Swiss-Prot record:
<feature type="coiled-coil region">
    <location>
        <begin position="93"/>
        <end position="138"/>
    </location>
</feature>
<dbReference type="InterPro" id="IPR051885">
    <property type="entry name" value="CC_domain-Cilium_Assoc"/>
</dbReference>
<comment type="similarity">
    <text>Belongs to the CFAP263 family.</text>
</comment>
<dbReference type="GO" id="GO:0032991">
    <property type="term" value="C:protein-containing complex"/>
</dbReference>
<dbReference type="InterPro" id="IPR025254">
    <property type="entry name" value="CCDC113/CCDC96_CC"/>
</dbReference>
<dbReference type="GO" id="GO:0005930">
    <property type="term" value="C:axoneme"/>
</dbReference>
<dbReference type="GO" id="GO:0036064">
    <property type="term" value="C:ciliary basal body"/>
</dbReference>
<keyword id="KW-0206">Cytoskeleton</keyword>
<feature type="coiled-coil region">
    <location>
        <begin position="176"/>
        <end position="200"/>
    </location>
</feature>
<keyword id="KW-0970">Cilium biogenesis/degradation</keyword>
<keyword id="KW-0963">Cytoplasm</keyword>
<protein>
    <recommendedName>
        <fullName>Cilia- and flagella-associated protein 263</fullName>
    </recommendedName>
</protein>
<dbReference type="GO" id="GO:0060271">
    <property type="term" value="P:cilium assembly"/>
</dbReference>
<dbReference type="GO" id="GO:0034451">
    <property type="term" value="C:centriolar satellite"/>
</dbReference>
<comment type="function">
    <text>Component of centriolar satellites contributing to primary cilium formation. In complex with CFAP263, acts as a regulator of ciliary beating that connects radial spoke 3 (RS3) to the inner dynein arm (IDA) and the nexin-dynein regulatory complex (N-DRC). The complex is positioned parallel to N-DRC and forms a connection between the arch at the base of RS3, the IDA tail and N-DRC.</text>
</comment>
<keyword id="KW-0175">Coiled coil</keyword>
<feature type="coiled-coil region">
    <location>
        <begin position="266"/>
        <end position="343"/>
    </location>
</feature>
């Protein structure tokens, strides 16, 4: 029993310690939040303002009727009163409201800038689509047409150069307008400084009008600067597109030359094939004529009788035999002639008369 009692007491003490730790953690978190609040309040105050507020709060606390003034104990840290904490909280709350308003204004301004950027991008996209359709209608369709394949790249280059010149002229115009606005701005600023220095005959309304004019001219100047930057970006993109189109044009030109050479080669081959076809047709006609002639001869051919064939064969053999005999006789006569000629030459040489050609 004694052991159970001791265990229950230890559990109770442990639970109390845990609750005490949780309570201390919650209190420390609240104190840290309060310290952070005070730090933000103090960081916005300079030393003189802080001393003035502190003294005023002390005096207001001492003069409250029905409340006893607290006696300051030496060595004890002085804490803020509820009124001082309320002032700090109100100040921080007011500052937070102002920060929220500033953040809202800033976010709205950024949102307007994003909307303006999107509208500008849409305008640029529409211009690019328009230029693309114009380029396709005037250049690409003519290049794709088989009748205008002989057109050189000068037309494309001239078209792109004209577009770049137009962009450069617009940029130069905006530059001049921007310079005029800057000059006008400097003039207005000089007049404003002169009027401020003189401080004669200038009312608050004049200053407000000048401020309004200054804001308006600043806005116009910012718009012109933005347009100039956008035009520069557009010029860079146009140059990139020009380079890309030049590369594509070079590739297409090479392909066109290859196709032209291939077409010429195939044309020559076709002409050669046509010539060979014509020659084959002529040979075919000749062969057909020869075939018809042979067929006609074959139709008129009659086989002789056997006895007649034997007689003809026998007479042909006798004629061949007679031809061979006469050939031998001719050879014998030629040999005899050569022998007589040599003998005659020897006799003439021996007689000293010399050789006389026969």
């Amino acid at each position: 029993m004694a052991e159970m009692t001791e265990d229950s007491k230890s559990d109770t003490a442990r639970k109390q310690l845990v609750e005490l730790v949780d309570l201390n953690l919650t209190s420390n978190a609240a104190l840290n939040a309060e310290i952070d609040l005070f730090d933000r309040y103090i960081s916005r105050l300079d030393l003189r303002t802080f001393e003035t507020v502190w003294k005023w709060q002390n005096l207001s606390t001492e003069k409250i009727p029905g409340r006893k003034a607290k006696v300051r104990t030496p060595g004890r840290q002085q804490l803020l009163t509820l009124e001082q904490k309320c002032v700090v909280a109100k100040s921080v709350y007011k500052k937070m409201i102002e920060d929220l308003k500033i953040a809202k204004i800033h976010s709205e301004k950024q949102l307007d800038n994003y909307k303006a950027t999107l509208e500008e991008a849409d305008i640029h996209l529409a211009e690019i689509k328009k230029e693309r359709s114009h380029f396709k209608r005037n250049i690409v369709e003519e290049l794709e047409d088989k009748k205008s394949m002989t057109m050189s790249a000068e037309k494309v280059m001239r078209y792109i150069e004209d577009k770049i010149k137009a962009k450069d002229i617009l940029i130069e115009k905006l530059h001049r307008k921007n310079s005029a606005l800057l000059t006008h701005k400097k003039k207005q600023q000089a007049q404003l400084r002169q009027q401020e220095e003189m401080a004669e005959g200038v009312t608050v309304l004049d200053f407000e009008l000048l401020k309004f004019e200054n804001i308006r001219f600043r806005k116009q100047l910012d718009e012109q600067n933005l347009k100039q930057v956008n035009l520069k970006l557009l010029a860079v993109k146009t140059l990139q597109t020009l380079n890309s189109n030049k590369e594509k044009l070079h590739i297409l030109t090479n392909e066109s030359e290859m196709l032209s050479s291939d077409t010429a080669l195939r044309t020559k081959l076709l002409v050669k094939i046509e010539e060979e076809t014509e020659q084959a047709e002529e040979e075919r006609h000749k062969a057909e004529a020869l075939n018809r002639k042979l067929r006609d001869q074959l139709a008129d051919f009659h086989v002789p009788h056997v006895l007649q064939y034997i007689k003809l064969k026998e007479s042909h053999g006798q004629l061949q035999k007679s031809v061979r005999e006469w050939e031998r006789k001719v050879e014998i006569a030629e040999m005899a002639l050569k022998t007589y000629t040599k003998s005659w030459d020897k006799l003439r040489f021996a007689a000293g008369a010399g050789l006389v050609p026969i």
